[in-house]
């Protein structure tokens, strides 16, 4: 079975930013997924450079994606370009968080 980008995004919905209580996909923190199976690269950002949960979020992303069938290596690529902003959140996240 081969996986698609959508499968990776769906798997990442279980990874939450504990400060905001929302998943990294709805928060707009996952900028992209590149599949070169068995390697998956996740390009992502955090809500701030000083995010205390950054290492935990990165580890959880690696763990959940590496559990997908066909994935042998997960690379996480933290970027600050473009900088994250609340406008990147899904409409549901904006509603829940009052934006």
Regions flagged by a language model, labelled:
Residues 1-99:
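Domain-level signature for proteins that mediate thiol-based redox and metal-cofactor handling
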């Amino acid at each position: 079975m081969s996986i698609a980008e959508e499968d990776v995004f769906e798997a990442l919905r279980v990874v939450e930013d504990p400060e905001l209580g929302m998943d990294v996909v709805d928060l707009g923190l996952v900028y992209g997924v590149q599949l070169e199976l068995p390697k998956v690269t996740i390009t992502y950002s955090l809500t701030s450079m000083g995010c205390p949960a950054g290492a935990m979020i990165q580890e959880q992303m690696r763990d959940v994606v590496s559990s997908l069938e066909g994935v042998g290596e997960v690379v996480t690529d933290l970027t600050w370009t473009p900088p994250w902003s609340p406008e990147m959140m899904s409409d549901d996240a904006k509603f829940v968080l009052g934006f």
